[in-house]
Swiss-Prot record:
Gene that encodes it: ubiD
EC number: 4.1.1.98
Cellular compartment(s): Cell membrane
Native organism: Actinobacillus pleuropneumoniae serotype 7 (strain AP76)
Protein name listed in UniProt: 3-octaprenyl-4-hydroxybenzoate carboxy-lyase
NCBIfam families registered for this protein in UniProt: PRK10922.1 (NF008175), UbiD family decarboxylase (TIGR00148)
Matches recorded under SUPFAM superfamilies: FMN-binding split barrel (SSF50475), UbiD C-terminal domain-like (SSF143968)
Secreted is among the record's keywords: no
Residues binding prenylated FMN, per UniProt: I175, Y176, R177, R189, W190, L191, R194, G195
Complex formation: Homohexamer.
BP GO terms, sorted: ubiquinone biosynthetic process
Length: 487
């Protein structure tokens, strides 16, 4: 399925009963977040608030509030099909030459999709139908949501921040929350390992004291939005991956005030710069952990231009204790991760990030164990192979007879196959999300690996237990007479 823009996607969702329009006046201050939270928790539809209190612009929430809508946004019917996207990413990350003509023919569909990777640059774009500059710029006129009563200010949540480092050809798209602090000022909260922060760091070294150009797109097409949160290889641009998802090239146009390319169909675009010498104290905000985070200084984004479509839609979300939209995205994108990990570690059978683990803080891996110490190798691989798992605090490794997605199965494996002293691996002084206040130092903490696999010679000197198995003949017999037993 191809969606040229966000509006085409909303039309499809509405036709499937996956979008509800609310005409009643609803306040962006707390009320929208409360309604969105209740709706998401019951697996409800996306919401278009058509009458925000005090504003003329409608607000879209809960767009990716179910795994099904995430899959639809990526052009698939369900989350199971996302495995194929993961296989494509694994292929692009480490392409292998075909071993023969038959394998070459088999790879043609993948290479054909590569033709959709280059962006298509438009001279005229819908996202620039309305242009505001100078004193016309006033962020207070946007219906920016205030999500929790303890939040310090309204927060831009679904903005796609577009940056480019001085030494890179490709541009980076990332989603970083942005605190409103003035009519043309936002605080750009990005962690040091994220693409935008890395671009900014390189810019400051190459261009001391010079403003760093930034554009932020709000309400892009679903493929571009989801490309910004998908674990794509560092060498692949988000626009290129969006083209793969969409099955046609991503249409972009040049920003009015800088050379950055922006999604041509975006609802709203904020353009401006970051002064390397200007920072502000960000937070506190309720975040995906279910707690308010600590305050910290981050760069200030000065907005010089706002461009938008006529009758623009403001796209927003909230974060809080799971389930929330980031947790749902994590659950769906879990299926994309698996083939990427399996390409590097073929012994991995399943990989699961439980939503209640705040999207990425705990992982359960099942493997076909082949030798003593195998579980520890997989732990180290999870922590080091993909940047997305740099902040995963707990990795539990089980055998392939355990269902990684069933806590009863996992806990049984831990309690019967794991000795706390022998099978727990602790690593200190590792990168940790600075929002994790449980770590002793902001940004630096420990990790725990739990080996819940059956132990091999060399891992134990005791005779290992034999699992109880039912007699298949008796099971078949009881199946045949079950309906006669009145049970």
């Amino acid at each position: 399925m191809k969606y040229k823009d966000l509006r085409e996607f909303l039309t499809l969702l509405e036709g499937q009963g996956e979008l509800v329009r609310i005409k009643q006046e609803i306040d962006p201050y707390l009320e929208m977040a409360e309604i969105s939270d209740r709706t998401l928790r019951k697996g409800g539809p996306a919401i278009l608030f058509e009458n925000p209190k005090g504003y003329r612009m409608p607000v879209l929430c809960n767009l990716f509030g179910t795994p099904k809508r995430v899959a639809l946004g990526m052009g698939q019917e369900d989350t199971h099909a996302l495995r194929e996207l993961g296989k494509l990413l694994a292929f692009l990350k480490e392409p292998e030459p075909p071993k023969g003509f038959k394998e070459l023919i088999g790879q043609l569909p993948q290479w054909k999709q590569v033709l959709n990777m280059p962006s298509k640059v438009l001279g005229k774009a819908d996202c620039q139908q309305v242009v505001l500059s100078g004193d016309e710029v006033d962020l207070h006129k946007l219906p920016i949501m205030h999500c929790h009563q303890g939040d310090v200010a309204p927060l831009v949540t679904w903005g796609l921040t577009i940056t480019q480092g001085p030494y890179k050809k490709r541009q980076n798209l990332g989603i970083y929350r942005q605190q409103l602090i003035g009519k043309n000022k936002l605080i750009m909260r990005w962690l040091s390992h994220r693409g935008g922060a890395l671009d900014f760091h390189e810019w400051k070294e190459a261009n001391p004291d010079k403003p760093f150009p930034v554009s932020v797109a709000i309400g892009a097409d679903p493929a571009t939005i989801l490309a910004a949160v998908t674990p794509i290889p560092d060498t692949l641009s988000e626009y290129a991956f969006a083209g793969l998802l969409r099955g046609q090239k991503t249409e972009v146009t040049k920003s009015i005030s800088n050379d950055l390319e922006i999604p041509a169909s975006a609802e709203i675009v904020l353009e401006g710069y970051i002064d390397p010498n200007e920072t502000a104290l960000e937070g506190p905000y309720g975040d995906h952990t279910g707690y308010y985070n600590e305050q910290e200084y981050f760069p200030v984004f000065t907005v010089t231009h706002i461009t938008m479509r006529r009758d623009a839609i403001y796209h927003s979300t909230y974060t809080g204790r799971p389930p929330d939209e980031p947790a749902v995205l994590g659950e769906a994108l879990n299926e994309v991760f698996i083939p990427i990990l399996q390409k590097q570690f073929p012994e991995i059978v399943d990989f699961y990030l439980p939503p209640e683990g705040c999207s990425y803080r705990l992982a359960v891996v099942t493997i076909k164990k082949q030798y003593a110490g195998h579980a520890k190798r997989v732990m180290m691989g999870v922590w080091s192979f993909l940047r997305q798992f740099m902040y995963t605090k707990f990795v539990i490794v089980c055998d392939d007879d355990v269902n990684a997605r069933d806590w009863k199965d996992v806990i049984w494996a831990i309690t019967t196959r794991c000795d706390p002293s022998r099978d727990t691996t602790l690593i200190d002084h590792t990168p940790i999300d600075y929002l994790d206040f449980a770590s002793p130092i902001a940004g630096l903490g420990s990790k725990m690996g739990i080996d819940a696999t059956n132990k091999w010679p060399g891992e134990t000197s005791r005779e290992w237990g034999t699992p109880i198995k039912k007699d298949p003949n008796v099971v078949k017999l009881v199946d045949e007479i079950w309906d006669q037993l009145g049970l």
